[in-house]
Regions:
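Histidine-anchored nucleotide/phosphate-binding helix
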Residues: 1-14
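N-terminal Rossmann-like or analogous alpha/beta NTP/dinucleotide-binding catalytic cores
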Residues: 18-90, 94-112
Length: 259
């Protein structure tokens, strides 16, 4: 953004979609589970909008992009945009085999009159800030540490969809939230704070497969305290406050209710 102001230019951020690890898990080894996303693309878009980024460009990660050489990536993608500066992460790699690096970009930039910069490694408490580290903090219920690494509280927002309606049979209705990639970087039962339109609501959430009812696919469901309205198809934002316990399998729904 500083360079955009300096050159009186617009800002654009590039992403690949899906994540490379998700792509390779489907085409190479379907048994290899990719790491869960910390921030889905819709969430990224909203954060960029809040940061007043002008444009977001999502590059489809497919066989064509995967096999594209670094030189072709530059000529077919970067050269198609009227760039005046280009900033990448400290460990940025691109092109087939991850052969493209910052040095190649800087050589290209010098020829084109484009400023190419790489960000310095960001550390906290002497350790590099990375997605792996953030996932570990979230999984270990260290939400304060995760917030420091993210620069914001960890939240997830999604559309409320129909489930099996089993919660209503024990007078504990839940809002089932659609998961775009089946998993979140957390699992278990959590105390949560939710934002639904203009309402701020407290509740309890379960992120897991629901073993008591024979579930297999991961599901995020939230029970909102003192709230029982039809909110299907609406979007809800969930802030995870504290982990209460791991997910457990109970003999029946009545035993689950007593918990």
């Amino acid at each position: 953004k500083n360079n955009a102001q300096k050159y009186n230019a617009k800002t654009i951020v590039f992403f690949t979609e899906p994540h490379a690890a998700e792509y390779f898990s489907k085409v190479r080894d379907k048994n290899q589970i990719p790491p869960p996303r910390i921030c889905p693309w819709r969430e990224k878009f909203q954060l960029l909008k809040k940061s007043k980024i002008d444009f977001a460009c999502f590059l489809k990660f497919n066989s064509k992009l995967r096999t594209m050489s670094p030189d072709d990536f530059i000529s077919q993608i970067l050269d198609s945009i009227n760039l005046v500066s280009f900033t990448v992460g400290d460990d940025f790699r691109f092109g087939a085999g991850r052969k493209g690096d910052t040095d190649l970009l800087k050589n290209w930039g010098e020829k084109k009159g484009i400023l190419v910069e790489n960000t310095e490694t960001i550390t906290l408490d002497g350790q590099r800030v990375s997605s792996t580290r953030i996932r570990e903090e979230l999984l270990n219920n260290n939400f304060n540490n995760a917030e420091k690494l993210l620069g914001r509280p960890y939240t997830f927002s999604g559309k409320i969809v129909h489930g099996q309606h089993l919660g209503r049979t024990i007078n504990i209705p839940t809002a089932n939230i659609w998961l775009p990639n089946q998993r979140l970087p957390i699992k278990g039962v959590y105390a949560v704070k939710c934002k639904l339109n203009d309402l701020s609501l407290n509740g309890i959430a379960n992120m897991g497969v629901r073993p008591t009812v024979g579930g297999e696919k991961p599901v995020l469901e939230v029970h909102l305290f003192e709230f029982n309205e039809n909110i299907y198809s609406q979007r809800i934002r969930v802030k995870f406050v504290e982990k209460i316990r791991d997910e457990k399998k109970f003999d029946n729904l009545d035993m689950l209710k007593s918990q």
